[in-house]
């Protein structure tokens, strides 16, 4: 199997707290995997670890053929992360934020322009500094930044949050198109009906571990809440 993500007994410590407490996970290239679980289960940490933003303390963790314990920088260039908060450079315009995202991943200016057009970020909006955007606009620009990176691995944390109906439909289209083009997608969501329609399979995270990796996309009861989330997504 050609794997995009391979974790074996992977542990990630935040201080003394094991946010990931021995994760075993295989994700094949081209899969769309729904990551489910209660708040504080470790979903956000798992996605951030896959993005090379959270260190692996022990165990094995390979993403896109790179060892996360040795080469996180190479991983960061090939992934796109949409977190809870829409991280943008507030002093840059929308257009410059997208160009920066494309350049940071080795993508092209044309990719940034295409992402801007696809997300409807044209006209006066392109020239606004990110600091002047509404919450919904920031979310759309952050999604466009992921698209501009042309990532091999999409990491989407509650991706539908903050988008209007048209934006949510567009996001679904983008996920399907990315998977059809060979990209891999991990999305964490509480909107099970919508997210399950996108996913090829789902996994449940609870207590920092994968509890069940064999679920069908059909929603099932969530595990009971555990510890609160200890990670802030930027």
For every predicted segment, state its role:
Residues 154-157:
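Catalytic Walker B motif of ABC-type/P-loop ATPase nucleotide-binding domains
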Residues 189-190:
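H-loop/switch region of ABC-family ATPase nucleotide-binding domains
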Residues 51:
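Helix-to-loop junction immediately C-terminal to a conserved catalytic motif
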Residues 99, 109-125:
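Conserved ABC ATPase "signature" region
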Residues 129-133:
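Conserved ABC ATPase signature
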Residues 146-147:
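ABC ATPase C-loop
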Residues 59-67, 75:
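Conserved ABC transporter NBD signature motif
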């Amino acid at each position: 199997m050609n794997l995009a993500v391979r974790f074996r007994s992977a542990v990630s410590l935040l201080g003394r707290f094991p946010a990931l407490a021995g994760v075993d996970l295989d994700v094949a290239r081209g899969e769309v995997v729904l990551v489910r679980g209660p708040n504080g289960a470790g979903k956000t940490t798992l996605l951030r670890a896959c993005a090379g933003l959270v260190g692996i303390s022990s165990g094995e963790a390979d993403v896109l053929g790179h060892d996360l314990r040795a080469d996180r920088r190479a991983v960061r260039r090939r992934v796109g992360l949409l977190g809870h908060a829409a991280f943008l450079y507030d002093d840059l315009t929308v257009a410059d934020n997208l160009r920066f995202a494309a350049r940071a991943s080795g993508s092209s200016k044309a990719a940034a322009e295409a992402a801007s057009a696809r997300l409807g970020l044209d006209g006066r909006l392109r020239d606004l500094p990110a600091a002047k955007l509404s919450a919904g606009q920031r979310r759309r620009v952050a999604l466009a930044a992921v698209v501009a990176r042309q990532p091999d691995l999409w990491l989407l944390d509650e991706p539908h949050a903050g988008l209007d109906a048209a934006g949510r439909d567009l996001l679904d289209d983008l996920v399907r198109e990315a998977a059809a083009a060979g990209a891999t997608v991990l999305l964490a969501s509480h909107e099970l009906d919508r997210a399950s329609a996108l996913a090829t399979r789902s996994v449940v995270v609870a207590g920092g571990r994968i509890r069940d990796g064999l679920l069908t996309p059909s929603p099932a009861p969530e595990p009971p809440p555990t510890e609160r989330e200890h990670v802030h997504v930027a």
